[in-house]
Amino acid sequence: MAIDSRGRKAARVAGAGAALCLTLLTACGGQVRDADGRTPSTTRSKAASPSPSAKGGAWKIAYSSKADNAELRALSVASDRDAWAVGLAGDDWDKTFFVHYDGRQWRDYDAAADLPKLGRLPLVELASSGPGNTWFFGTGNPVGTQDVASVIARWDGSRWRDVPLPPRMTDQIKDAAVFGPDDVWLLTGTQAGELPGQWPVEEQTVWHWTGAHWTEVRLPARADAIAGRAPDDIWAVGSAPGAQVDNNTPGRRATPAAMHYDGRGWRLVPAPQFQPPVNAGPGDDRSAVLNDVVPAGPDDVWVIGTQSYPGDDPDEGQDEAPVLAHWDGSRWEEGPTSDQLPGPRPVAPDGAHGLVFRWGRLRADGTYEKIDKSPLLPGKTGQVTKFDRAQQLALSELVQVPDTHEVWGAGSIAAGGGGSELNFSHGVVVVHEVPGG
């Protein structure tokens, strides 16, 4: 059984690459090498866009917070009987709250009783290697402020226990990969004082927990996401400085970066190069970053990112579009691009050789299914009024439930604005059952 390193978020695609690659993808130009350094074929094929298809069902609400001023920001699913979610609540969004699923229902959990330092933690991550080993990572103050309050804790099956912080904790927790109580990788970083396309050394740092202390490891490039199937098969993705923007600008364009850990060390894997959309304007002022990685096997890895390129109107600056690519063990192949595809995050495998995004599913046959919104929640009157019908579902996290064709999402359902007394925001967990899964 493959271990998903991020709370069972990224693995379990179960051979998605072979199926999707044949029907969806376009080989990228440029020479790349596989994980063993071999030079593969660089055969190109015609680009494909996802074809429209019937709707893929709707999100179902599995949990809704009692508080009407709350939202969930992180989710980890160790199994279909063990899951955690973390969010913020309160008039000033000053309370961090935990909820736990035991296979029957979601219950509030008083994590503050276990973690006295728990306060307002707007930047949070959850990751798990299985029941009895779920990790929580939280940063208190907004990015770039002083006196950052951070908390790292581990659920051991009975309570949350504090874990020491890395010796030089930065102001942003990005992502984490958990393989066991004594094998955890943590990405941190900073966004203060950066020039475009240039990054401080903190952006190339990953911390490794060995059970007793954190070890600082320098990565070959900046990383924004990390995930893996096993302790000796881990991927990190992000960006690296590319060509200089122009002679008058010190910054450099961002280029995609992919890194692999084989149990001995980290090394760069030549990253995919994305073709600009057909509606892109002239010029080579293009950049791309990888925002997430979904590994399912040595020859089955998805990366998701964002590409910036000149728009058709030079006066309006650059446009952006999501990008996908698949690693088949020897080369990257560019995935489909379409206005139907949503942004790069959140994303999860669907257990049926496809990917699930916020509002749709990319199937193995290349078709795109729209996922409808969840049912309407009653507002503050206890009914669904005209005001309440404007409510929106926002998702911060998507996770495939291990060994199933279900994807769970965490976020909020909210309505209102402008200070209305009818405003509400409920933290929610929603479920999507993959059709035919």
Sequence positions of predicted segments:
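C-terminal motif of bacterial Sec signal peptides marking the signal peptidase cleavage site
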Residues: L24-A27
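Residue-level hotspots at or immediately adjacent to binding/recognition sites across diverse folds
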Residues: G29-G437
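Bacterial N-terminal signal peptides that target proteins for export
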Residues: A2-G17
